[in-house]
Amino acid sequence: MSLEIVVALNGDSSYPNSSISYHMELQFTIADKTYKVPQYISVECFARAIVWNLDDLNNLKPFVATIMDAPLSAMHQLDPEVLAFITGVCLQKFQLGQQEVNEHCLGHNLIDFDTMTFSQFVDLDTFISKGIAANIVEIAAILYGAPHNTIKRAPIEDIWGAVIAVSKWREQCYKEYDEFFELEDREGPQAPSEGGEANIQLMWWEAIMALANEDFLKIHQVVERPWREALNYLTWKKAQVQKQKLEQLKAKNDLQRRTK
């Protein structure tokens, strides 16, 4: 087993005004097989590595193996000092911190939150409710209108700012439409409890069917409408139903009083 650290130079030093950057490549070789720490953590790699709870030290080796796309058996063959060094590098690359919102990613543009379709809104809400980390590829694909196979290769830093931004924006939408989402007793969107994912999907399916007037053939038409237009109607419709229920209850109570 051998550990190799390579400092790579990007750019052309023969030109005085050229842009030159450096990056460190860390790799090790076991049985003629070389494994490298990637220059950046891709969206796909992040989704696979985030499942390891790093509070448990037993998960450090599989975490590093995931980052380096190496078998766990290779981790077991590393000297403790080498493993500790590689682990530190991987953890450093995995730290995201506060990232700016990128308007472009791999040739695709970030969608406008205020003009997204109802379909995009529903899909984002569903995936975020199920967990950002577990659905980061799907969320990023919607945000940038990119195919999954494209966006999963993007550096996680390039899309993380937009993911956090849409999550905060979603919370504001919930507060704005608290009558529809029934947030009177809650502070904002909640993580789904056991069976909650199915409830969220059912809630949106019922909402879509209400917009389509229970006509399956109209579903595509209504989900392509602006999200705000859809929520405005759904909020009004819900208020009308509640008003009707109150009127029916009042009529029932009046009838009971008259028959006594």
Which sequence ranges carry the predicted segments?
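An amphipathic, hydrophobic-aromatic interaction surface with interspersed Lys/Arg
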Residues: S2-Q256, K260
